[in-house]
């Protein structure tokens, strides 16, 4: 009899263990997606996201200012200066969350033009060709002091509205086109992030299965790679906003993290870049205490730490730089049957060549994914997910490039870009939205078979049919 009782008890325990393994405990993780947003409201055309922890955010859609393969070093530094200016404008209690969404698509002509036979055949040739596209969003979030939850402060709210418009004006003055997402657009963007689907017109949600390495959802899975391991920060001593590659024995500058748009097998990549703006006086005081603590125990590692802190304090005093808490992660989405280890190997090898060793202990996959939702960045763990650095150094790790797109011009001359898909350019430099010159003369020169006849045919069509 005792044996039967023991066997029944063991069977019950096995059943409970199987249930917990398959369906979870039904605790906090079960409702983790329900505990993010309170609502999304419209405020004078701006979609404002309210989180259940009391923060509110606005989303700016923008285009990165540096054209890929432009070899313009100054433009990389100009972006760093712009970001430093935005940090100064926002000040304490705000966070800047930049999301670069890299998407693998198939080419299709969406111009809705009634092409003649020759042009129609041209576009049919490229239909279905895979290429990489990119979208960029900048999310401004105001922190809510947890002790003041459920107490509305009209002054802070008005300050938030003023500052987000200041940010938009600053970016416009710097030549970076931006616009705020409305309420419906913000909702769609959040849904697309949740579904990890940025290319289909209709999206659907699926069940999530989470383990220590990946997050599976329907016919796809993703993995979150934290760029910096807080316990052992492996970054180069000197960071620049660009790195050099060799092209035909010539050095060419590219973005420091340009590798994010060429990850093998990836269908979608989201590069999350977060800057949290703390109280500067408090952080300097904490740095001073840390320096004194290291100095009280003289050994080689502590002496190096003291020297590093002194250098930072000297830069802040001389150049009025700002301290920020930072977090960077990559969310890589692949088909369910793809080998995610290939993406891991590619990222580890590529970043190690830059002197950056990505974290191998990002076991909190679900928490990193949820805290990377637009407007939910303050959910990042203060002790484990954020590290303190200067705003200039953090800006170097941001993605600054955009892929060349079709120009806004009535004189569209199509050539293929480096990915092999048609892109329209204005060869005159004076008909498009962005004027390069007010007068231009040109002639067509090229060897046999290079496309001179087709080129002149397009120009004749546009000019003599009065399409300009």
Predicted regions located by residue number:
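Extended, folded cores of ATP/NTP-driven motor/assembly subunits in large transport
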Residues: 3-400
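Glycine-rich phosphate-binding loop of nucleotide-binding enzymes
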Residues: 49, 65, 73, 80-88, ...
């Amino acid at each position: 009899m005792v044996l039967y009782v023991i066997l029944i008890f063991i069977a019950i325990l096995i059943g409970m263990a199987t249930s917990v393994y398959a369906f979870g405990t039904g605790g906090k993780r079960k409702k983790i997606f329900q505990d993010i947003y309170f609502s999304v409201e419209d405020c004078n055309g701006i979609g404002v996201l309210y989180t259940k922890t009391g923060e509110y955010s606005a989303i700016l859609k923008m285009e990165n200012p540096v054209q890929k393969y432009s070899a313009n070093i100054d433009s990389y530094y100009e972006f760093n200066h712009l970001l430093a200016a935005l940090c100064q404008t926002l000040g304490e209690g705000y966070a800047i969350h930049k999301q670069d969404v890299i998407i693998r698509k198939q080419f299709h002509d969406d111009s809705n033009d009634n092409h003649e036979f020759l042009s129609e055949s041209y576009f049919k040739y490229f239909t279905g060709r895979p290429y990489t596209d990119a979208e960029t969003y900048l999310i401004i979030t105001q922190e809510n002091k947890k002790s003041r939850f459920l107490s509305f402060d009209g002054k802070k709210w008005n300050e938030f509205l003023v500052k987000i418009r200041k940010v938009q004006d600053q970016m416009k003055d710097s030549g970076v086109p931006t616009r705020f997402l409305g309420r419906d657009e913000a909702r769609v963007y959040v849904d697309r992030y949740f579904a990890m689907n940025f290319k289909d017109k209709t999206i659907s949600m699926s069940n999530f299965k989470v383990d220590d390495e990946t997050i599976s959802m329907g016919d796809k899975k993703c993995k979150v790679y934290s760029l910096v391991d807080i316990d052992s920060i492996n970054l180069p001593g000197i960071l620049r906003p660009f790195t050099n590659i060799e092209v035909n024995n010539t050095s060419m500058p590219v973005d420091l993290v340009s590798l994010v748009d060429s990850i093998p097998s990836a269908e979608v990549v989201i590069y999350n870049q977060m800057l949290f703006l703390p109280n500067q006086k408090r952080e300097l005081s904490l740095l001073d205490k840390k320096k004194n603590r290291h100095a009280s125990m003289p050994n080689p590692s502590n002496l190096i730490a003291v020297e590093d802190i002194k250098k930072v304090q000297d830069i802040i005093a001389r150049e009025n730089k700002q301290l920020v808490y930072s977090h960077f992660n990559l969310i890589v989405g692949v088909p369910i049957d793809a080998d995610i280890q290939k993406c891991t190997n590619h990222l580890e090898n590529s970043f190690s060549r830059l002197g950056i060793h990505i974290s191998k202990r990002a076991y909190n996959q679900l928490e990193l994914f949820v805290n990377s939702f637009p407007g939910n960045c303050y959910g990042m763990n203060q002790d484990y997910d954020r590290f303190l650095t200067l705003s200039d150094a953090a800006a170097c790790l941001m993605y600054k490039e955009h892929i060349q797109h079709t120009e806004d011009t009535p004189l569209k001359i199509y050539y293929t870009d480096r990915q092999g898909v048609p892109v329209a350019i204005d060869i005159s430099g004076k008909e498009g939205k962005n004027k390069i010159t007010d007068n231009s003369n040109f002639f067509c020169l090229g060897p046999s078979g290079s496309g001179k006849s087709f080129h002149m045919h397009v120009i004749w069509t546009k000019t003599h049919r009065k399409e300009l």
